[in-house]
Amino acid sequence: MKEIKAILRPNRLSVLRERLMLLPNFPGMTVSKAEGCSARSVLQGSARPKDDLADYVPKVRIEIVAPDDTADEIMDVIIKVGQTGQVGDGLVWMTDIGRAAFLYKTTSLGAGRSDMLNKPSAKDMPL
């Protein structure tokens, strides 16, 4: 399993969603509002602290947990859609996940964890 995270320009989100939904095994995504600044704006700096608080640019943060066999394809779509060639386009990265599970069912997403299916459900466990 892989976790793919991306910080993108908000105006790229609708196109990205359309393209990702075309992938046959797209697992879904979580989207959050974010703010950020590029390294260039940090290095240029500001003489007034008030300016430092106002120079953040609106972004969206996307998080996707995907099987190993689809993660590279998802990341490629994010790169193609998000890249405009301008400073501030954003960032995308991928990390390994040892184990994940859907909360609405007892299906484990992590490799080697099929034993989850034989364990008692959460409703059978005391709180």
Model regions: which residues?
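Positively charged, small/polar-rich N-terminal and surface patches that mediate targeting and assembly
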Residues: 1-127
